[in-house]
Every structure is written in structure tokens, then in C-alpha cells.
């Protein structure tokens, strides 16, 4: 089934929070692997990036989950470390942080960490394994030589003499197993079995929590707890949500770079095949001749395809099987400080605000065929194919990672074929702004911005049997199920990983209960009996809210 499972993985990782005391921002998130063979999304929900700022973000990885997870782990701190951030210049800080984390992906230390996240062996591990294999071969040969040295001539003849004439004739073109060297283990061994860890619910715990990680096979979370790995810097205010799904061997991301290198070998093999054919006896059937003509036509078509792929290549850009080089991620990051919403985006994930029920896009989808993006790609020496892919590879034009598209030494990072420089949009929040949605393209490829806003708008005021408003995460879960394709027979719509966060700009429940609470205080002064009744009612409502 290619890149898809036989059945979708619909287990969701979900959670809710109410924000920080100084910045109450109720939020809910959910993530689902879906039809994909692995989960490559990640996200951040950090109500207190600092005492005045909240951060929410989604990362949609491609070529592996490692870059998305790395960004979820380190980007929040990198943003805070920027000089511009400390000076209160949040737009500049986001631009600098995106470029800074992208540059870090090329360092040896980070490449090793990415390899560990991805489950790929590092160069050191490969070398050690190679040396160990050579030692094993040497030991086997030494043991065999020692055994033969102690054998009699009769025993040697018995072992080798009978096999002297049993070997197959040597092939003129060189024998082989039919397997390409290095075709196995491109992504290391299969990952560990899926596992989850749950933390107990805390009824009176802190309201500010940070959710950091990716989601694939974990149980639905609660407001105060999620499954995950502790120790992530951005998740110290609360647990994270993380689990690993079994990995299949990685398909070579830069296949189109390799084909031309094999072209000369294929040509030599074709020449040798033709020589062998000429040496065979004459007189074969017309059916065989037709089959040979069909084969020739197929070979010519393959050669034409190879020539087209070779035309797409850029000199000096060899495909490199290295995390951060053949893998990357989109990133959409929203910072909320006071009444200011600042959104940075690189890629095709999206942030949308509901303004009096109307969808307001706070980000642009970066596609290679867009005029601005296409001009930059061509200027960097690349081209966009008919199916909207950069040099036949990526179908987006901005991303963190993907460094084999960023090797033009004559251009700065922001002007490379694939750029990590984000677009920035700023919005001053008013009473008309109800909520914000941040999601990967697994959602936006199925539903438009307005359709998502309408869907949430129709659910956000619904109450459960106890009269409580629905959890935001339950609305997101319903949205994910709505977007999931029934099968994979279509064009891939609804078959992608899905991650979505809903953030409300106003406290939920609190505004509705405040007038009643004030009235009860007045009754307490006027009537002791009324005070007792209302006091008991207050306790019940408080218990529900907690």
C-alpha cells in the first residue's frame, strides 16, 4: 500500500488546559497518525513561555519525525534566547529563531541527536559495525585455515574435490543477487513497540501546563496530565505527550539524484545483454521478436524518464542520507502577549482566527508554484516540476531542515531554494476575536479555513449531560475524524497525519458565572438562610469547574 497502512491508526493523543493566571487562554489539542505508516507531527502548547507570553505551535515533519520533534523540544528556548525577544521585538525574534534552529541542524552534534531520534545509525556506529564484521570474517578465516592445516590429503579431497566442477558458469556481465547494495536499513532497525504512560489527574493542580511532543498511539489525555517524556526544557511546566510507532525502512528521499549515477551502469548492462543475444543461435519465433520490441520500447521510455530527472538536477547537489538534510518540517508558531497575536509560518501548516464567525488567515501556505516562491527557487538554481515539486522533490517551498536544497554557497539562508525564513503576521485582538486554530495540512487539505471555523463554532457552545461546556480537545477529535478518509483509493486527501490546536481568547464558563456569583454575595449580606443555600450551590459549581 506504499506510504499507507492497511487500516488507519485512529488512536488520538489529546489534552486540555486553561492557560496561565495572568493570561487565561483555554486550549485543547489532539493528534492522530491516521493512514500514514508513522507519525511525523509535533506541537507545543506553552501557556507561559514567560510571565507575559504564551506560545502555541504545530510542526509537520516530512522524511521522518526527527526535525519536527527537535523543533518542539528546542525552538521555544531558542526564541527566548534571541536578543530581539529580550528587547520586546517579537517579530524579529521569530525570524531570527527560525533561521537559528535551521542552521543548528547542520552541526555534527545536532545531526547525531537527530539520528538518535530517527533511529538511524550514526557514522561512528556504522564504522564500529563495519570493523566488527571485518573482525568476524578474519576470525572465521583463521579458524578455517587452522582446520584445513590439520586435515589429511584424503579429507581435503573429500571436502573440495567433489565440488570442483559443480559451480555455475561465470556470467559475462557479472553475477549478482538482484538487490541493490544498501537497500536495507535506510532508517535503521524497526522502532520499539508502541507504549504509553499516563500520569494521574490532578484536580487542584496548576493551571499553566506545557504540552510538547508528537502524538500517535497514546490514550486520550486529561486536563492535568498527558503521556510523555519528562525532561524536555519546554515541558517543565507540565508533562508532554509522546509515543513511538514502529518505523518501516526509510525510502530514499533523494532518489532522483541517484538515478543518473546508475544510468551509465544500466547502459553498459544493456550493451552486454545485446552482445549475449547476438551470440545465441539464429531462428526464433515472431512472438519472441515482438517481446523484444516491447522491451526495447520500455527501455527507451525509462531512458527518457531518466533524462528528464537528470535535467532537474542542480550541479553539486547530491542526495544525502542524513537527518536534517533529507528530512525537515513545516513550522507555524503563534505568540500571544497581551492583546497582540504574532504568527510566524514556514511551510503549509496554517493558523486561522475566528473573527465574529469569519475565518481570518494568519499565515500563508508556501507552495513552490507561488510567484514569490518560484522566483526565489529559480534564482537559487532550482526549478519546479509540473506537479508542483522543487526539483521533483518537495511540494512546499519553505521549511526547517531539508538542507540538500540549501547548498548554494553564493546565497544567504533566506534566499535558498527551500527557505526557513517565516512570514510574520500580527493581529491586535478585540472582542470580535473568539478563538484561533493551528493545524497541519492534514486538516487544511480536507477543509477550508472557513469550514473549520464553522465546524468549531457549531460545537464550542455545546454542553454535556452535566451542563458543562464540551472540552475543546473533544471538538478537535471530532474534527480529525471528520477529515479522515474512509480509504486510500483517492488522491491522498484525508490520509495524512493530523494535529490541531484550538485556543480560545476568552475564559470559558468564568464570564457566565461572575454575575451570579456577585448576586449571591449580596444575598449573603441580606439573608443568612439565602447565604447558606447559595454557599452550597457555589461549592457544587466550584467542584464542577475543578
From Swiss-Prot:
Cellular compartments annotated: Cytoplasm; Membrane
Biased composition (Acidic residues): 123-139, 259-312
Chain residues carrying a lipid of type N-myristoyl glycine: 2
Cofactor(s) needed: Mg(2+); Mn(2+)
UniProt: Mn(2+) 1 binding residues: 60-61
Annotated Mn(2+) 2 binding sites: 60, 441, 496
Phosphothreonine sites (modified residues): 122
Tissue: Widely expressed. Most abundant in testis, skeletal muscle, and heart.
Entry-linked Pfam families: PP2C (PF00481)
GO function term, MF aspect, one: metal ion binding
Residues that bear Omega-N-methylarginine: 22
CC annotations in GO: cytoplasm; membrane; nucleoplasm; nucleus
Gene Ontology BP annotations: peptidyl-threonine dephosphorylation; protein dephosphorylation; regulation of cell cycle; signal transduction
Top-level EC class as recorded in UniProt: hydrolase
Spans annotated as Disordered: 116-139, 161-328, 512-546
In-chain residues carrying the UniProt-annotated modification Phosphoserine: 183, 527
Alphabetical keyword list: Acetylation, Cytoplasm, Hydrolase, Lipoprotein, Magnesium, Manganese, Membrane, Metal-binding, Methylation, Myristate, Phosphoprotein, Protein phosphatase, Repeat
Keyword Membrane among UniProt keywords: yes
Topology in membrane: Lipid-anchor
PANTHER family the UniProt entry points to: PROTEIN PHOSPHATASE 1G, PROTEIN PHOSPHATASE 2C
Family: Belongs to the PP2C family.
Subunit structure: Interacts with NOL3; may dephosphorylate NOL3.
Protein name as catalogued: Protein phosphatase 1G
Underlying gene: PPM1G
Amino acid at each position: 500500500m506504499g506510504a499507507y497502512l492497511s487500516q488507519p491508526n485512529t488512536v488520538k493523543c489529546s489534552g486540555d488546559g486553561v492557560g496561565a493566571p495572568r493570561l487565561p487562554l483555554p486550549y485543547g489539542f489532539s493528534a492522530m497518525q491516521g493512514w500514514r505508516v508513522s507519525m511525523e507531527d509535533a506541537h507545543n502548547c506553552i501557556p507561559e513561555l514567560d510571565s507575559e507570553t504564551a506560545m502555541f505551535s504545530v510542526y509537520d515533519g516530512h522524511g521522518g519525525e526527527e526535525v519536527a520533534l527537535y523543533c518542539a523540544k528546542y525552538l521555544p528556548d531558542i526564541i527566548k534566547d534571541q536578543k530581539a525577544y529580550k528587547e520586546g521585538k517579537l517579530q524579529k525574534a521569530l525570524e531570527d529563531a527560525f533561521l537559528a534552529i535551521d542552521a543548528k541542524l547542520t552541526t555534527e552534534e545536532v545531526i547525531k541527536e537527530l539520528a538518535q531520534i530517527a533511529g538511524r545509525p550514526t557514522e561512528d556506529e556504522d564504522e564500529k559495525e563495519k570493523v566488527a564484521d571485518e573482525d568476524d570474517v578474519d576470525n572465521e578465516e583463521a579458524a578455517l585455515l587452522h582446520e584445513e592445516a590439520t586435515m589429511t590429503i584424503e579429507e581435503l579431497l573429500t571436502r573440495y574435490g567433489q565440488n570442483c566442477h559443480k559451480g555455475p558458469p561465470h556470467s559475462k556481465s557479472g553475477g549478482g543477487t538482484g538487490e541493490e547494495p544498501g537497500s536495507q536499513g535506510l532508517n535503521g532497525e524497526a522502532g520499539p513497540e508502541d507504549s504509553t504512560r499516563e500520569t494521574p489527574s490532578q484536580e487542584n493542580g496548576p493551571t499553566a501546563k506545557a504540552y510538547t511532543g508528537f502524538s500517535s498511539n497514546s490514550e486520550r489525555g486529561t486536563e492535568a496530565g498527558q503521556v510523555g517524556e519528562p525532561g524536555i526544557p519546554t515541558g517543565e511546566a507540565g508533562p508532554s505527550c509522546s509515543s513511538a510507532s514502529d518505523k518501516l525502512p526509510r525510502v530514499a528521499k533523494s532518489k532522483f539524484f541517484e538515478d543518473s549515477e546508475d544510468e551509465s551502469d544500466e547502459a553498459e548492462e544493456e550493451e552486454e545483454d545485446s552482445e549475449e543475444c547476438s551470440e545465441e543461435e539464429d531462428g526464433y519465433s515472431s512472438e519472441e521478436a515482438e517481446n523484444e520490441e516491447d522491451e526495447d520500447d520500455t527501455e527507451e521510455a525509462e531512458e527518457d524518464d531518466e533524462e528528464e530527472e537528470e535535467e532537474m538536477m542542480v550541479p553539486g547537489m547530491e542526495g544525502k542520507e542524513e537527518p536534517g538534510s533529507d528530512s525537515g518540517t513545516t513550522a507555524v508558531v503563534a505568540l500571544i502577549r497581551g492583546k497582540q497575536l504574532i504568527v510566524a509560518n514556514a511551510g503549509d501548516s496554517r493558523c486561522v482566527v475566528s473573527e465574529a464567525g469569519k475565518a481570518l488567515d494568519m499565515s500563508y501556505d508556501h507552495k513552490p508554484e507561488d510567484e514569490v516562491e518560484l522566483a526565489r527557487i529559480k534564482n537559487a538554481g532550482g526549478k519546479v516540476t509540473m506537479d508542483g515539486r522543487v526539483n521533483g522533490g518537495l511540494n512546499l517551498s519553505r521549511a526547517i531542515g531539508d538542507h540538500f536544497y540549501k547548498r548554494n554557497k553564493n546565497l544567504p539562508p533566506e534566499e535558498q531554494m527551500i527557505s526557513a525564513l517565516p512570514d510574520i503576521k500580527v493581529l491586535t485582538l478585540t472582542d470580535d476575536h473568539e478563538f484561533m486554530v493551528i493545524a497541519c495540512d492534514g486538516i487544511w487539505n480536507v477543509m477550508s479555513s472557513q469550514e473549520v471555523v464553522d465546524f468549531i463554532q457549531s460545537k464550542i457552545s455545546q454542553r454535556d449531560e452535566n451542563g458543562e461546556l464540551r472540552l475543546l480537545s473533544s471538538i478537535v477529535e471530532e474534527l480529525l475524524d471528520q477529515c479522515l478518509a474512509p480509504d486510500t483509493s483517492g488522491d491522498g486527501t484525508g490520509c495524512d497525519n493530523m494535529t490541531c490546536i484550538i485556543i480560545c481568547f476568552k475564559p470559558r464558563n468564568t464570564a457566565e458565572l461572575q454575575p451570579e456569583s456577585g448576586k449571591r454575595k449580596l444575598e449573603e449580606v441580606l439573608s443568612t438562610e439565602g447565604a447558606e443555600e447559595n454557599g452550597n450551590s457555589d461549592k457544587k459549581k466550584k467542584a464542577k469547574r475543578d
